[in-house]
Amino acid sequence: KDGKLSKEELLNIYPDLYYYLDKTIASAEDTWVLDYMDKYKEAKVFNVYTDDVKNYILDKNKNSIEHFKWTNKFSTTRTLLSTRTDIQCYLWIDGLGADWIPFISQIVKEHESEGYYLNEVFVATAKIPTRTDINKVDIHALSGGLLEKSGDLDEVSHTCRAYPKYVIDDLETVRKTTHKFLVEHPGMKIAIVSDHGISYLSQLLHGYNLKGYKSDHYGRIAEVPLQSKVSVVSDEKYDVIKMPDNKTVYLCALRHESLIAKVPEGMGCHGGCTPEEQLVPIMIIS
């Protein structure tokens, strides 16, 4: 109607997109994030910054205190899986956020005739800033060498791909990667994990153009060396993270507006504190 497809029509025309947009079901310590992921996916696919997403962010990421309230309820992937002795191999898809849970669930379902079943699904948190170099350490420590990194959604997100190419490409990448891993690991207990997610909404909004900081990850992070003369003040726009090395302070964007320049059109991003950047899936398959 009015140029729009019904869900049934979408299922017939583009089933992978239908399953990506399906309802997010997982074990989560704060269930609003599941509804948020569904709203995020709609905004991403329609390429519009919706009021639903905006209102969630203005409420849940109003400032660093509100952000801490919900993010502190979630454990990291390493914490959730550190006591597990039953996982035989890990698939790490760089940049795979919790928004991908329904789509991967469907791919596993398609392999049920081969004996694969999705046993458990959890939502975990990445560490802030949501960068690969900060979060990959835990993944490597957790997997004990039983790790395959494949289907990189991160690297390609930093290239400009015209809408809707990035939606189409990433669906294809996740399907091929998951299918290949299942086929190559018959009879094994598998955990699909990630280091951080990706947001495709920051490209739709302006940047705050904060002065005196070094831009990192297209302004999702502003870097302040401790020896810098730039003073760091509290602000509702970002969370202040002092790194353990005591050499750097990072300002991490709480909202979709980046802290420095605007994220280029057609580009995904991470580093900040939005739920799609921060929350990652743990999917246990046997």
Where is each model-derived feature located?
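Feature captures the catalytic ectodomains and active-site-proximal regions of enzymes
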Residues: 1-286
